[in-house]
Every structure is written in structure tokens, then in C-alpha cells.
Design a protein with these regions (language model features):
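Surface-exposed molecular-recognition determinants
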Residues: 1-227
Length: 227
């Protein structure tokens, strides 16, 4: 190799943080009838599942997790393409066509109570993969914070109201802490301090404003955190 450079070979590469990504995130392809079991069998401890019928483009995206759905049978679930709450989404129904299921590992054991923030949260976390699932009850107070059980600051955050109709609010480090984008919409980022209180996540908590979509008083929420 030229002076000041190294040869391109695996011995000269920095060891990856995650050597086998399929331990923490994987994808299943199967019939609609079998996609639930196929997806939940992926990764070491599948704790978050996202299912979509590949054969029918008008069908819903089905999301569920092991904090709210201990048995991982798809009930309760939410739909990423709608504002519906868990009651409206109802009982899981298998897709009719060949489907895809994305699975994320969310750690082992029961959810833990996290009191790092001003609002207590129930959390399943896989810090090795930088992923956690948090559920909490809003208090309507701007600047309220919620613990996420990860070792690094959250880079991408998805929050959904489980108890009321609301959009899927997302914060990403690339767009900053003053705006949100929405899974269920094709609109551009919307700036509003009521979303995140103009505050970026830390290595222990994320912060919410007063908007009903993430902090309505008495409403229940789920947050998916990616560090």
C-alpha cells in the first residue's frame, strides 16, 4: 500500500459494534397465515414486530410489541399508516397475501420501570443494538422527560398515542428537536415546540412537549427508541 495508507483487508478494519446484525434485527417472508409466527421467531428475543401484506397494497401496516402484547399474538396492535388507537385497530387478523415481517430484538426478561425522567416508563431494551420500547402515561406538562434505558442518546424516536387517535410523531437527529415528521403522512417536517419542547434526547431520557400526540394528560403512549 502507498505510504500513509493500509491495505484493504479485514485485519485493518475497525471491529463492528454488532458483529451479527441478525441477532438483533431480521426479516421474515411467508404467507399471510404464517407471517406472525415466522416474524416472532426471528432474532434472539423479538420484542417489536412490523407486518405488511406484500400482495395487497391497500392493506395496513401492523405494529405490536412485547411490552403491550406479552404473548406477541398481535393484539393489541397499531397501524403505522393510520391515526387509529389500539381499540379501533382491534384484534390481529392475518394478512390474506404473502407478507413481510420485520423483527427487532428488545432484550430479555420483563419490562422494567424506569424513573430517570419526570414520567415513569415501562421499558424493554436491548442496549447492545441501541433499541428500546417505552410505554408511559402523559401528564400534559411541557418539558416532561421519559427514560429509555439505552446507553446513548436516541437518534430516531417514534411516538404513538395508544388510547386516542393521533399521528405517529417522529424525531430524528438529522432534522433537529424543533420539528416532527409523521409515519402516517407524506407531509414535510412540521415545526412546533409542543412536540419535543425543542429538546434533544440524552443518553438517559427523551423529552416531550404539550401536544396530545405525545403527552396528552392521562393518555397512554408507546415510544420506539433507536440510538
Amino acid at each position: 500500500a502507498p505510504s500513509g495508507y493500509k491495505s484493504l483487508n479485514t485485519a485493518n478494519l475497525t471491529p463492528p459494534t454488532i458483529t451479527d446484525g441478525s441477532k438483533y434485527f431480521d426479516v421474515a417472508l411467508d404467507t399471510g397465515a404464517n407471517i406472525l409466527s415466522a416474524a416472532t421467531s426471528k432474532t434472539d428475543n423479538a420484542g417489536f414486530i412490523w407486518i405488511k401484506d406484500r400482495a395487497n397494497n391497500s392493506t395496513n401496516h401492523i405494529l405490536f410489541n412485547k411490552v403491550n402484547d406479552v404473548g406477541m399474538d398481535g393484539t393489541p396492535h397499531l397501524r403505522a399508516n393510520t391515526t387509529d388507537n389500539e381499540v379501533t385497530c382491534g384484534t390481529y387478523s392475518a394478512p390474506s397475501g404473502n407478507s413481510v415481517g420485520w423483527a427487532w430484538d428488545a432484550g430479555t426478561g420483563n419490562p422494567v420501570t424506569n424513573n430517570d425522567g419526570s414520567i415513569a416508563s415501562q421499558v424493554r431494551a436491548q442496549p447492545s443494538a441501541g433499541f428500546s420500547i417505552c410505554t408511559y402515561t402523559g401528564n400534559g406538562t411541557g418539558g416532561a422527560s421519559i427514560g429509555h434505558e439505552l446507553n446513548d442518546a436516541v437518534e430516531f424516536l417514534i411516538v404513538k398515542d395508544r388510547s386516542a387517535a393521533a399521528s405517529w410523531h417522529c424525531q430524528h437527529s438529522a432534522i433537529g428537536n424543533t420539528s416532527a415528521i409523521f409515519l402516517n403522512s407524506n407531509s414535510a417536517a412540521v415545526s412546533n415546540s409542543a412536540y419535543w419542547n425543542n429538546t434533544s434526547p440524552t443518553n438517559s431520557v427523551f423529552t416531550v412537549g404539550t401536544a396530545d400526540g405525545m403527552n396528552g394528560s392521562g393518555n397512554t403512549y408507546v415510544a420506539y427508541c433507536f440510538a
